[in-house]
Amino acid sequence: MKILIVSGFLGAGKTTFIRRLSRNIGKRFVILENEYGAAGIDGARLGKDAAEEGNIWEMTEQCICCSGKKDFASSVLTIANAVDPEYLIVEPTGVGRLSRIIENLKQIEYERIRLLSPVTIVDIYSFGRYLEEYPELYKDQIASAGTVIVSKTEQSGVEEKERIRKFIEKINPSAQIITDPYASMAREEFENFLKEEWGGGKIQKAETEEKLPDVFSLETVSMETPEKLLCFLEDMVCGKYGNIIRAKGQLQAGTDFLRFDVADSRYTVTGAEEKTAGKAAFIGELIKREDIEENFKKEARGRKMKYMARKAP
């Protein structure tokens, strides 16, 4: 079993990349998703693409680079022995240190479990902000990768992409850097991610612990109308509910079932693939939990609420 780690900070596009990868590789694989504190929102999206070729394993209560590393190692060994896929694709939480995940996997690596060259995805729009606000973590994810993919570059010019490339090269001179949209990649290019084994490069060691965002999750939620959801998201990106850098959820709004996604100061709303119980997760600092909860239908409030203050993994 070969293991490909797809790392990246909050909202960089890891799940979208994995969906694109799964549609192109034509191999038997399993996806291990570590969606810490986010109520498993992305599992269904990945599951639709992996249903025929593999399975989805979710770890939503712990970070696989720190507190949950023993469970993570156990899950990897279980997948290798019970499922025995050709490939395991690992999607860590966006606030996990890639270097520590690599260290954890190296401890259980043997002739039947091999680590492929890790991939890190960075958002071209949020690159500067996250590099400034979370430098240790952000640099760790870039420096520990074999390939760095710059996402959301469809509307970016050559100069902007080259500027980001130079920043990345300073952090990781040996990385392959891709700035063209991965939506335009050929099948052969996706298959190359499954061929290059990790060469045992230098693993970054964090000298200091870094304060990371808090996570606030809600389950069994709904909204009165789609319009109210749009107003809620607009207020969120304007800072009304604290410094929210990432949010996502799926819920019923009126008669519609919708999915929302917030990354930095941008948001999208699309139709949900399945009609499931409403879930939402918010990541950031100084989160105004009660104000957020007030936006949802009264009968849904307080049924199940989860709040976690994260420390640096």
Question: Whereabouts are the PLM-identified features?
Answer:
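Short internal beta-strands
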Residues: 31-33, 149-152
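Flexible loop/N-cap segments at domain edges
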Residues: 282
